[in-house]
Regions:
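Residue-level signal for inorganic ion chemistry
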Residues: 6, 34, 166
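A residue-level signal for beta-strand positions that form part of recognition/binding surfaces
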Residues: 12, 18, 33, 83, ...
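Core SAM-dependent methyltransferase catalytic element
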Residues: 21-50
């Protein structure tokens, strides 16, 4: 059991209580909760995650960053499969845990290119993105984008953040005057 392993590895950690919340007995999804307490007289240390340098592996991300962003993110990257994450400072070692996301999902490394994630568009400020297609709040183009349709822009800038009133809501890839929609399919409106 993960909790027992954690307590065995961390002196001063004591399991107070644990509970499984079954989905058929509560309203909502099922969960597991454990209350662990550090004894006052014990020093409970948490190992920090060691990240290896990924200079060669993230070359395509760095190219994307140079071409489409106005910032350089620090080198706290983790690669899981083809998914690239920006890991928070002082992130504990979670190697033995099943983790859904290791931090900010930057995007996916594909053959000879990087495809930015929806989360990255929400993380960045508009001034940190080189190309922003701004849409006014009363413009019907917003609904075209949210439905997953292409938008005619008349430009060919590559990756562009689509923003409403200056707030980025997602990505599009612009080529030959058309912005191809990269808004996540699960978030698109269907009416």
């Amino acid at each position: 059991d993960v909790i027992e392993e954690f307590i065995a590895e961390n002196e001063g950690a004591v399991l107070i209580e644990k509970e499984r919340l079954w989905p058929h007995k509560i309203k909502g999804e099922g969960h597991f909760v454990a209350k662990i307490q550090k004894l006052d007289d014990e020093d409970c240390r948490v190992k920090e995650m060691k990240l290896k340098k990924l200079n060669n592996e993230i070359k395509e991300y760095r190219n994307f960053e140079k071409k489409f962003l106005n910032i350089n993110l620090d080198n706290r990257f983790m690669l899981r499969g083809d998914n690239l994450y920006l890991v928070p400072d002082e992130c504990p070692n979670v190697e033995k845990l099943k983790v859904l996301r290791y931090g900010l999902h930057l995007g996916v490394l594909k053959k000879n290119r990087f495809e930015p994630s929806h989360a990255l568009s929400h993380y960045l400020k508009p001034e940190q993105i080189k190309y922003v297609q701004n849409i006014e709040l009363n413009d019907e183009t917003i609904f075209d984008y949210l439905r997953g349709n292409v938008i005619n822009t008349g430009e060919s800038r590559g990756w562009v953040a689509v923003a409403v009133e200056g707030i980025p809501i997602g990505w599009g890839k612009e080529s030959n005057g058309i912005l191809k929609n990269h808004y996540p399919k699960g978030l698109r409106i269907n009416y």
